[in-house]
Amino acid sequence: MPASRTKKAPSTHVPAAGSAREKLIAAAIATVRYKGFSATSVDEICQAAGVTKGAFFHHFASKEALAIEAAGAWTDIAEQRIFTQPDWTRIPDPLERLLGHIDFRLSMLDGPAEDFTCFVGTMVQESYNSSDPIRAACDASIRTYALRLAEDIQQAIDIYGIASGVSAVSLAYHIQAVLQGAFILAKANGNPVIARDSVMHLQRYVIMLFTQK
């Protein structure tokens, strides 16, 4: 039986400063990560953002339109918080940098699932068959992440080689698949430990690919 835990309000910070549009995007990301896209209403997003419903429809024609723009904003957040700011990005050796990336993702798996789960991964699980524009926006965000990570993987392959049949892009997508699956396991189990175990297995697998050529 999944471990139980006390539910709380969305914990992702919605900035007090910024335009109404920025507040709505931040509120959408926080609320969808907490309760899912379908269960999130425009009224809840407006309340979390501290703006009126009129302001919402001034900036966005629909909840779907906001979701699409928020997916792009999520891509920008990932670029800064995952690929630019952390110390692992400055490790000189590309293989060590790749392993540093996985270590960093492992370190993020703590606390309630809404604090570490993927916004676009959450949305696309619900909307892949009901909103093609949302599906495409989520795909673009996930693809951007994979291609960004593939740059480091390719540099590591160029230096160390890799197991036969493995490309940088395919491995980057596999890393994404493990992470997204780990988020789902943590949500189902109610505990991030199971997700951490999955990412630790991922790290062992990546090391094996570069040592068993």
Give the residues covered by each predicted segment.
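Hydrophobic alpha-helical connector segments
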Residues: 69, 83-116, 168-175
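Hydrophobic alpha-helical segments that form the core
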Residues: 116, 121, 166-185, 201-205
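All-alpha amphipathic helical-bundle segments outside canonical DNA-binding/catalytic cores
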Residues: 92-96, 136-141, 158-174, 193-197
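Amphipathic alpha-helical segments used for helix-helix packing
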Residues: 97, 111-136
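Hydrophobic alpha-helical bundle segments that form small-molecule/ligand-binding pockets
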Residues: 129-134, 143-171, 208-213
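N-terminal intrinsically disordered/low-complexity leader segments
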Residues: 1-19, 157, 212-213
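Helix-turn-helix
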Residues: 2-4, 23, 27-65, 69, ...
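Amphipathic C-terminal alpha-helical segment
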Residues: 108, 175-193, 206-213
